[in-house]
A protein has these predicted regions:
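Predominantly cytoplasmic-facing regulatory/coupling regions of multi-pass membrane proteins
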Residues: 1-90, 139, 144-251, 277-318
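Transmembrane helix boundary and interhelical junction motifs in multipass membrane proteins
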Residues: 63-69, 98-108, 136, 249-267
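Helix-loop junctions at the membrane interface of multi-pass solute transporters
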Residues: 71-76, 96, 107-116, 131, ...
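Membrane-interface alpha-helices at helix entry/exit sites of multi-pass transporters
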Residues: 82-86, 104-105, 116-132, 275-286
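Hydrophobic, aromatic-rich membrane-embedded alpha-helical segments
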Residues: 85-113
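Structural signature of transmembrane alpha-helices in multi-pass secondary transporters
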Residues: 92, 131-135
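Short, membrane-exposed interhelical loops at transmembrane-helix boundaries
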Residues: 264-280
């Protein structure tokens, strides 16, 4: 592994990685072009009022996620909410090309780029770890509802049950972590003291969980409107199943481009639920395209806010 990392850091390794990424991107673009040439653009015959409603709920989900992430920092180290929104938008846009889990690197870089707080890289990484736990915990009620109300196969319901169980385990960790790092037996260790200074309280973690749950619900409502806009189905349980499958695939440690992985998982769950393969792929691609477009809007607005703030004249005390 060490040799592989050293090879990737070398000049030839970087060139090879860039070439491989370019070839992969061109290959995906060619396959997508062939697919759309044969089947047509998914949004060509969509109800654009419903598409607009879906985009609005996707935008709302970004806001809720930024508010939730904001709660996971210590009060003295919290970045501005717009910085966190920009990081989320950049990660979603980068997910169209970057491999799975690399979006966290983008988030850290963007938060540090804004430079509006005293958060170090380690603090941002810890907040992302907590955000991952809270994301999983917030999916628990949605996965349980999808498993209970979906007409899918037993295997699909079992998969939803696994996601719900993972959410329960994450909720337990969230509850115990602040007490664990503050334990008298562990506080003498430097790592435990560092964690104790930066780990949010259980109360703040549960507030973050409420915001993140609201973010997932807003996205599920947006997917429901998009299903109706494309004439796929008018089924909220199906929207929940698509959401849970896509979110669960994002947890894979190593995967192709994040957006492609989520689209593939979502399309697979639609096919397993009785939707035609071509229609399922079209919906998954359309959903990811709109999500990326909304994320790009969030990123542009946040970048404009950051630029305006940087050039705003400092207030002079009277």
């Amino acid at each position: 592994m060490r040799r592989f990392i050293e090879l990737c850091r070398s000049r030839n390794g970087k060139i090879a990685l860039n070439v491989a990424s370019a070839v992969l991107g061109i290959g995906v673009a060619i396959l997508a072009a062939r697919h759309f040439a044969a089947t047509g653009w998914p949004l060509a015959n969509a109800d654009f009022q419903l598409v607009g409603a879906a985009g609005g709920f996707f935008l709302l989900s970004h806001a809720f996620k930024a508010f939730g992430w904001h709660r996971l920092f210590a009060p003295s180290q919290r970045p501005h909410k717009m910085a966190l929104a920009a990081a989320g938008g950049a990660a979603a846009v980068g997910g169209a090309a970057l491999p799975g889990r690399f979006d966290d690197v983008v988030r850290v870089a963007v938060v540090r780029r804004f430079g509006a707080s005293d958060s170090c890289v380690g603090t941002v990484c810890l907040s992302l770890f907590m955000l991952g736990l809270i994301d999983t915990a917030a999916l628990m009620p949605l996965a349980s509802s999808a498993a209970a109300t979906s007409d899918s196969s037993v295997g699909v319901r079992a998969g939803m049950g696994v996601v719900a169980a993972a959410g329960l385990a994450s909720a337990i960790i969230i509850s115990l972590l602040p007490r664990l790092v503050a334990s008298g037996r562990l506080i003498r260790f430097r790592v435990a003291r560092w964690l104790a200074e930066r780990t949010t309280t259980t109360r703040e973690a549960w507030k973050a969980l409420v915001f993140v749950l609201a973010s997932w619900v807003a996205r599920a409502v947006g997917l429901f409107f998009l299903l109706a806009a494309l004439g796929v189905s008018v089924s909220f349980p199906l929207a929940l199943a698509f959401l849970v499958a896509a979110a669960a695939s994002a947890a894979l440690p190593i995967a192709p481009a994040g957006a492609a992985t989520q689209a593939g998982a979502g399309a697979a769950i639609l096919v397993a639920s009785g939707i035609g393969t071509s229609q399922a792929i079209a919906f998954a691609v359309a959903a990811q395209a709109i999500l990326i477009a909304v994320a790009a809007v969030v990123l542009v607005v946040a970048a404009a806010w950051g630029t305006a703030r940087r050039f705003r004249p400092a207030r002079v005390a009277v």
